[in-house]
From Swiss-Prot:
This is Flavin-dependent thymidylate synthase. HAMAP family: ThyX (MF_01408). GO terms for molecular function: flavin adenine dinucleotide binding; NADPH binding; thymidylate synthase (FAD) activity; thymidylate synthase activity. Belongs to the thymidylate synthase ThyX family. Homotetramer. It holds the Pfam family Thy1. Binds 4 FAD per tetramer. Each FAD binding site is formed by three monomers. The lineage of its organism: Bacteria, Thermotogati, Thermotogota, Thermotogae, Kosmotogales. Its cofactor is FAD. DUMP binds at Q75, L76, V77, R78, E86, R87, S88, G89, R90, R156, R183. Pathway: Pyrimidine metabolism; dTTP biosynthesis.
């Protein structure tokens, strides 16, 4: 399952270990029991979520392959309860792929952590032109340094954080729900929100009961409760 994100990025599910009822099995092992009926298992998942017993959900593991701008990657790695391997800029050359926003945003006067899109055509045109020109110049400087024989690990320091990188990201469902609370929310940066929504879509498709319970009892953000968000 692969979802396109932004204009050149994606998030792809590589593999998943477990499903909704892996949490049920983990919870019931305390009593020497396993699965019962689908109805009772669903009730248990809802009970666990409602009462904050989230450790059984750590037994559901997702592995993703993600292509994303470096500045989004830097936010992703702040979620420490996950395993990450990123493409190396020391051993591989960066291709000419970078993120350009479709529209300019300005600081939100109400939500100080957020930003809002502007309808000013002149600002959009001039802002995007300046972003594109600056990135192109830095990438050409990077290529020139490589041509001069400068090591990749040093030449890359001129590159902007809009460059695309790739990583493998492995995370359990409990940590994923924490990620969604923080990133599938209007306080998060717009570009980060788009990746969080893609993660939520995959989570919902693979663990629909857990996802439903999460939204009902544990989700503290706002985007996932917006109709049509996925």
């Amino acid at each position: 399952m692969e979802i396109k994100v932004l204009e050149k990025g994606f998030i792809r599910l590589v593999e998943v270990m477990g499903d909704d009822f892996s949490a049920v099995q983990a919870a019931r092992v305390s009593y020497g029991k396993g699965l019962t009926t689908p109805e009772r298992d669903k009730k248990l998942i809802f009970y666990l979520m409602e009462h904050g017993h989230h450790s059984p959900f750590e037994h559901i593991i997702f592995k993703f392959h993600i292509k994303l701008p470096i500045f989004v990657m830097r936010q992703l790695v702040r979620h420490r309860i996950a395993s990450i391997n990123e493409r190396s800029g020391r051993y591989t050359e960066f291709s000419d792929e970078w993120y350009i926003p479709e529209r300019i945003r300005t600081p939100d006067k109400v939500n100080r952590q957020g930003s809002v899109f502007v309808d000013d055509d002149d600002l959009n045109s001039e802002g995007i032109r300046l972003i594109e020109e600056t990135i192109e110049k830095t990438y050409q400087a990077y290529k020139r340094l490589l041509e001069m024989g400068v090591a990749r690990e040093l030449a890359r320091i001129v590159l902007p954080t809009s460059m695309y990188t790739e990583c493998y990201w492995t995370i359990n469902a409990r940590s994923m729900m924490n990620f969604l609370n923080l990133r599938a929310d209007s306080h998060a940066q717009y570009e980060m929100q788009q990746y969080a929504l893609a993660v939520a879509k995959i989570f919902k498709s693979k663990c629909p009961v857990t996802y439903e319970a999460f939204l009902n009892f544990a989700y503290t953000g706002d985007l996932l409760k917006t109709e049509g968000c996925l």
